[in-house]
Amino acid sequence: MTERVALVTGGNGGIGTEICRQLSSGGYRVVTTCVNPEAEGVEAWAAALREEGHDIGWVQCNVADFDACARMATEVEAEFGSVDVLVNVAGITRDAFLHKMDADNWRSVIDVNLNSAFNVTRQFVTGMRERGFGRIVNISSVNGQTGQFGQTNYSAAKAGMHGFTMALAKESAPKGVTVNTVSPGYVRTSMTDAIPDKVREAIIGQIPAGRLGEPQDIARAVAFLVADEAGYINGANIPVNGALFCSF
Ligand code: CAA
């Protein structure tokens, strides 16, 4: 069988990098999107991964922009081939209490974290259906399940992502395409580094595992879901949160 192609949006972020690593180790041809290659230092990022033995491709794309995603899909398919696996990771926070939140911070989080799932997935789902195989994983958050102080925008987007997953799973299952969500808890990345120290320490105190998650913990769940053998797991949400939030 030819190598499967996996596209990871925001694959050069904290969680994304580890997803790229694990998929590359699993034999996938991995490509990531990044918004601003220079500012994000994506060349150096790719070179460091190459040193480790991972040849990760990258394309510039603002996933909040539908037309940019259409252009990105053409570029990816021309250079790397049909996309079999899509992992929607790209996400941002703009935390503020709602009574202090401006409209830009509401809109940018909904655009980057939720509208992107439509903008990117829409480009690849037709091909997956036609080929009778596809794996889509949406990275949500425990805060989409529970709500969080300062995150009406982020919690709404992340909860919306799983609604998107469930509806698309029903549409896609007859065509051999699975769509699942992974909901990380608090993971050691620059995003959690930005939480005020006092608040972060209080959050860690509530995690039964007694620590933040590691990006590897999340990537493991993604690698499991995208496997060819995982075809009957569809429309599911896998929480990876150290028992911070348990539900049935
Ligand atoms: N839990 C409990 N109390 C919290 C809290 C939290 N998560 N966040 C804020 N508070 C409390 C503060 O401790 C403070 O209480 P006191 O007045 O008693 O000291 C009160 O709310 C007001 O907080 P601030 O003084 O910080 O007010 P602010 O307007 O300057 O900022 C805030 C508010 C933006 C919510 C800021 O506190 C903050 O950034 N909190 C962290 C929010 C958070 O948890 N974000 C998650 C980011 S990581 C992520 O999103 C990844 C993921 O998927 C899990």
Residue ranges, per PLM feature:
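Short C-terminal tail/terminal secondary-structure segment
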Residues: 146-149, 223, 234-248
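Residue(s) in the substrate-gating loop at a strand-loop-helix junction
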Residues: 141
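Substrate-binding pocket helix/loop in short-chain dehydrogenase/reductase
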Residues: 97-98, 105-110, 192, 203
